[in-house]
């Protein structure tokens, strides 16, 4: 929690104002942020200086694991995070490849589970990683990437957190996640939960021990209409200790994650937080 607040304070103190063409808003911006999450000690990196809706964050990433491309499927899991980008993004609404209401296109999990090859076949990146790690194999290329520049025009949004690299040291699994852009008041709240949970889940289904998760952000920013709430409200609050994440031990395979797992299979223990803060969201 402290490293999150330190990043927020750094943006407030050192950030440079940049115009964002997509949203039409200014962003207070810093370049390069490195966060580390201790999955080995189960120190769940959830924000405590305001209420964090952790279930939606996990539900969203579960949708990525399943390769979903429709906002309705994410809503069924418990995440409404794709409603706006699928249905209110004017550039996407005008795109002739859009299939209709709630269609997201070839974004995130679609690339992770069905990356297109020139011959028309697809690559299941996640399946390969799970199979390798389960056999104790780390070929130094256990990489799940959602970033496919050749298909940017086939989706409603370029991936922000776009790549996840798994590494094995003995029987301990590590994760390094890369993010090109981060809305720190809103997006990082979700992203840090997702990085931690992804490592914990992958360790569980491959029979490994979770180690550290390393989260690398390039462009970290606070939108101009979020700044007052961050500087004058959230940064004035004292954080609470980190809670723990409990995952149903019956989750043992990738197929489990693809089929029957729901939010009922996750629980956060010992979570204390301050009152919610409603930050504006930029589409």
Swiss-Prot record:
Molecular function as annotated in GO: thymidylate synthase activity
Swiss-Prot/TrEMBL GO biological process terms: dTMP biosynthetic process; dTTP biosynthetic process; methylation
Residues where dUMP binds: 22, 180-183, 191, 221-223
Enzyme kind, highest EC tier: transferase
Keyword tags: Cytoplasm, Methyltransferase, Nucleotide biosynthesis, Transferase
Enzyme Commission number(s) of this protein: 2.1.1.45
Protein's UniProt name: Thymidylate synthase
Taxonomic classification: Bacteria, Pseudomonadati, Pseudomonadota, Gammaproteobacteria, Pasteurellales
Encoding gene per record: thyA
């Amino acid at each position: 929690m402290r490293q999150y607040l330190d990043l927020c304070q750094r943006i407030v103190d050192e950030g440079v104002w940049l115009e964002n063409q997509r949203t039409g808003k200014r962003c207070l911006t810093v370049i390069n942020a490195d966060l580390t999450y201790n999955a080995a000690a189960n120190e769940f990196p959830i924000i405590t200086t305001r209420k964090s809706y952790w279930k939606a964050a996990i539900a969203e990433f579960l949708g990525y694991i399943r390769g979903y491309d429709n906002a309705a499927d994410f809503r069924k899991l418990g995440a409404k995070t794709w409603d706006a980008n699928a249905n209110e993004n004017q550039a996407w609404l005008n795109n002739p490849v859009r299939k209709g209401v709630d269609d997201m296109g070839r974004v995130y999990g679609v690339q992770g589970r069905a990356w297109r090859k020139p011959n028309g076949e697809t690559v299941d990146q996640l399946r390969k990683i799970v199979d390798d790690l389960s056999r104790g194999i780390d070929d130094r290329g256990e990489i799940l990437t959602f970033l496919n520049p050749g298909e940017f025009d086939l989706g409603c949004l370029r991936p922000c957190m776009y790549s996840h690299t798994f590494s094995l040291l003995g029987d301990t699994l590590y994760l390094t996640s890369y993010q090109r852009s981060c809305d720190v008041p809103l997006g990082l709240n979700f992203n840090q939960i997702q990085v931690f949970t992804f490592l914990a889940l992958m360790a569980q289904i491959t029979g490994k021990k979770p180690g550290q998760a390393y989260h690398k952000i390039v462009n970290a920013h606070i939108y101009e209409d979020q700044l007052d709430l961050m500087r004058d409200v959230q940064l004035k609050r004292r954080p609470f200790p980190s809670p723990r994440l409990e995952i149903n031990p019956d989750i043992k395979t990738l197929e489990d994650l693809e089929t029957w797992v729901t939010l009922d299979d996750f629980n956060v223990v010992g979570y204390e937080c301050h009152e919610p803060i409603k930050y504006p969201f930029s589409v």
